[in-house]
Amino acid sequence: AAAASGGAQSAAMGRLVPDTLHSKALEKNLYGDTPDRPMLVYLPASYATSPGRRYPVVYLLHGFGGAERTWVTLGPVKPAMDTLVRNGTVREMIVVMPSGRNVFGGSFYTNSASTGNWDDFVSKELVAYIDGKYRTMARPESRGLAGHSMGGYGAFALGMRHAGDVFE
């Protein structure tokens, strides 16, 4: 009843945590986009109760025109993850949903002299930040990428460019 009324969440449910990362890779973009990049981080239910446990991470990249909240406003990531974990379809994991939005609506997660180094932001800074702040399994075989539209392109391109060293 508490979860349904917006009160305390059930122990069987994960939670969404807003976070922000200041990106050196995006500081010098020519259009004045902020290098402070918002994200949402889904933490599984056991994250709060199992302090010694580490988790694999999936980086979920949104499409053109979207932002970090797209996955929770247009797609039910949190309830979907809670259900998939509860049913045993997937194991518990951390899901990171960073904003790849820029002044043009989307970065395509590639490095650019004009819009900033988005590949470096995701593959170097974001991964290092998440591994440092959250209890991740900090190795390529425990990291995955997924995305929709522009994010699907980004997931494919980043996965290919950084296969074995960052993602596997």
What is each PLM-predicted segment?
Residues 2-168:
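Non-catalytic cap/lid and distal C-terminal segments of serine-dependent acyl enzymes
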